[in-house]
A protein has these predicted regions:
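Helix-start/capping segments and mature chain N-termini
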Residues: 1-67, 73-78, 95, 99-277
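Phosphate/pyrophosphate-binding loops at sites that engage ATP/ADP/AMP, CoA/4′-phosphopantetheine
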Residues: 79-84
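Ordered, amphipathic secondary-structure segments that act as subunit-interaction surfaces
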Residues: 85-94
Length: 277
């Protein structure tokens, strides 16, 4: 994934190879930073306001200084022209800064990873792993912080087992979420996805698919569903801003069928993004 542009608080556009975080920034020392990653379509960020809302909420949960939305928007505006009216990935970061302050904002524009479309074509595989975020709220469930070591360790564990992705389940076997995705599956004309009450991330793409599903002919059920319900589904998929709708074709070695919902929702998502750009 190639970095296209970088902008930092107090510096504006900088060479992406330059250092922009102080060595004593608590984002580096303690992981005290919040971030958002979103898709850029035709040079325009998709649902930027929703991502800024979540960035603000995450920063508050972590105890960071309040996000200065205008400053973050200005930083985003500096890097977006480098997309050349094409598609890209935009990451927004709000750090605690050094102990005496001030906080720092970053905007990083990158190419969309090349592996995503081939993966969508073949379908992704996953393994289930134990997750405990809902049971221990001090682990900041639903917060997008840069303390992503657990998620990355889970992804590495999944890959060591020959899978692309990990799906977290709790101690009672209830499906939670993927390492960087929300999880969905279909029974007939009903789509199921774990409830936000379980402490999962309130995905912006998840919310968008809930809006789009009725027009595609599906009802959505949010709740606490057992892993066996997912394994018995007619089809399954994940959602995220950068990966969009990604079909799941195997979980824990059990094959899942390809179905129409993931394709319909992916098409509807792209059409909405095009209309918004």
């Amino acid at each position: 994934m190639s970095v296209l542009a970088l902008a930092a608080s107090g510096r504006g556009l900088v060479d992406p190879a330059e250092a922009v975080i102080r060595a004593d920034d608590e984002a580096l020392l303690r992981g005290r930073a919040a971030f958002e990653t979103l898709r850029v379509y035709g040079g325009r960020p998709f649902r930027l306001e929703a991502h800024l809302d979540r960035l603000t909420a995450s920063a508050e949960s972590i105890g960071l200084p309040p996000v200065e939305r205008l400053r973050v928007q200005v930083l985003a505006g500096l890097v977006l022209p480098k997309a050349n009216r094409g598609d890209a990935s935009l990451r927004l970061v709000w750090t605690a800064g050094p102990p005496e302050g001030p906080p720092s904002g970053l905007a990083l524009l990158s190419e969309v990873p090349e592996w995503i479309e081939p993966a969508r074509e073949r379908g992704a595989t996953a393994v289930s792993l134990l997750g405990v975020r809902a049971a221990v709220p001090w682990l900041l469930p639903g917060v997008k912080s840069t303390s992503y070591a657990v998620n990355m360790a889970a992804e590495a564990e999944a890959k060591s087992r020959g899978a692309d992705e990990a799906v977290f389940v709790d101690g009672d076997g209830i499906v939670l979420e993927g390492t960087v995705t929300n999880v969905w599956w279909r029974h007939g004309d009903t789509l199921r996805t774990p409830s936000l009450d379980l402490g999962i991330l309130a995905g912006v793409t998840r919310a968008t698919l809930i809006e789009l599903a009725p027009a595609c002919g599906y009802t959505v059920e949010e709740g606490a569903f057992a892993l066996r319900d997912l394994l018995e589904a007619e089809e399954a998929f994940t959602s995220s801003s950068v990966r969009e709708v990604m079909p799941l074709v195997e979980i824990d070695g059990r094959a899942l069928g390809r179905g129409p919902a993931s394709e319909q929702l992916q098409k509807a998502l792209r059409e909405l993004a095009a209309a918004s750009s």
